[in-house]
A protein has these predicted regions:
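Bacterial N-terminal signal peptides that target proteins for export
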Residues: 1-8
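Repetitive helical segments and hydrophobic/amphipathic motifs
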Residues: 11-14
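N-terminal signal peptide c-region/cleavage motif recognized by signal peptidases
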Residues: 16-18
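N-terminal segments that cap or nucleate solenoid repeat domains
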Residues: 21-58, 371-374
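Conserved anchor residues at repeat-unit boundaries in beta-strand-based tandem repeats, strongest
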Residues: 35-45, 58-69, 81-92, 104-115, ...
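Short beta-strand elements of solenoid repeat domains
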Residues: 50-53, 60, 73-76, 83, ...
């Protein structure tokens, strides 16, 4: 600042006489110890001037009635600097602030805080442009990370909050609702492999009801918990197979019905994506098995109803009749004996419809070794 120039100008006015008591160039000391030199009016800073504060801070710019007002530059002893508009000793209007960490803000201010539209260039290469309130990202804005990720949408207290769209560096993207920086509420996430989830979220994980579209044509619609299919849902395969029932941790688990495209149906218990527990299986040809299952095969006790009218009731192992069992034919004839790997194996008794024994004998690997008619 050229104090001499100010002095000459003021002296010229003083010669004129009218402003003798109004304008001057001089020195003023504030109550906080700050020292001012520059234009004065009624013995207070007014116009252009410079103030040096006891802690080393310095302001150079315009004053009005003893307060910073108009254009000015504030340099702090910690290395931060503000260049812009002031009103009643506060940053207000448009201005640029340089932070010690090399962040730079350009935009609107109100009562010493970033308020309105502005742009922040962060030291790490990130950028934000949008609305601010109380020196935080609040309202609509766009944040671009140095790595290439982009979020455009609503903010609250520096966090993604409200409706917005995020695109990650790998190309995956989410569009929907946010809360406290998390995906929360309803939204759609598209994966890089083409998969897509549309539904409810809770603190960044799929939680609630949703639909997941797989890039291979599979589809799941139902309940989620902690990003896993958990609860009731329907899983559809591109070949026409359908499972409807309970899920746990992403797998068919609980009670459910699986319908194959070829017409076969299973209804019963599942565990870890397999038929486990009590269940009923209907083949496409009409045969029916009802009983215990283990690892997708009939295992334990059960009944096998054949389309020819015969019924087997007894033990199963690895999907075949194994152990003690009874076959009841359509005409009422009953075979009681041992089975092994789906074949008659061991001693047997055969009865007629009235329960009378009509034959006994022995089978080996499905072959009759001997018999005795009664």
């Amino acid at each position: 600042m050229n104090v001499l120039k100010y002095g000459m100008a003021i002296c010229a006015m003083m010669i004129c006489g009218a402003a003798e008591a109004q304008l001057s160039v001089g020195y003023y000391k504030f109550k906080n110890g700050a020292e001012y030199s520059g234009e004065l009016k009624r013995r207070k800073p007014n116009g252009m001037g410079r103030t040096v504060y006891p802690n080393g801070d310095m302001y150079e710019g315009q004053y009005l009635k003893g307060k910073r007002d108009g254009q000015g530059t504030m340099m702090l002893n910690i290395g931060e600097r503000y260049i812009g508009e002031w009103k009643e000793d506060m940053k207000q209007g448009e201005g640029t602030y340089y932070f010690t960490n090399n962040n730079m803000y350009v935009g609107a201010w109100e009562q010493d805080q970033q308020e309105g539209k502005g742009k922040m260039d962060y030291f790490n290469g990130d950028k934000y442009e949008g609305e601010w309130s109380k020196s935080k990202r609040n309202g609509q804005g766009k944040y671009v990370w140095a790595g290439g990720a982009v979020y455009e949408g609503h903010w609250k207290n520096d966090l993604k909050d409200g409706s917005g769209k995020m695109i990650w560096e790998d190309g995956s993207q989410y569009e929907g609702h946010w809360k406290n920086g998390f995906r929360h509420g309803k939204g759609t996430f598209t994966y890089t492999n083409g998969d897509k989830y549309t539904g409810e979220w809770k603190e960044d994980v799929q939680d609630g009801k949703g639909v997941y579209y797989f890039h291979n044509g599979e589809k799941y619609e139902g309940e989620y918990a902690n990003s896993e299919r958990t609860g009731k849902g329907v899983y559809t395969y591109p070949n026409g197979d359908i499972y409807e029932g309970e899920f746990k941790n992403g797998k068919q688990d609980g009670q459910g019905v699986f319908k194959w495209a070829n017409g076969a149906v299973y209804e019963g218990a599942w565990r870890d994506n397999e038929r486990n527990g009590q269940g009923k299986y209907i083949w496409a040809n009409g045969d029916v098995y009802e009983g215990e299952w283990k690892h997708n095969m009939a295992e334990g006790t059960g009944k096998l109803f054949m389309t020819d009218g015969s019924v087997y009731e007894g033990s199963f192992e690895r999907g075949k009749e194994h152990g003690k069992g009874v076959i009841k034919e359509k005409d009422g004839t009953v075979f009681e004996g041992e089975f092994k790997n789906g074949k008659k194996d061991g001693d047997f008794v055969e009865k007629d419809a009235s329960g009378k024994i009509i034959r006994t004998g022995t089978f080996k690997n499905g072959r009759l070794l001997d018999d005795k008619k009664m």
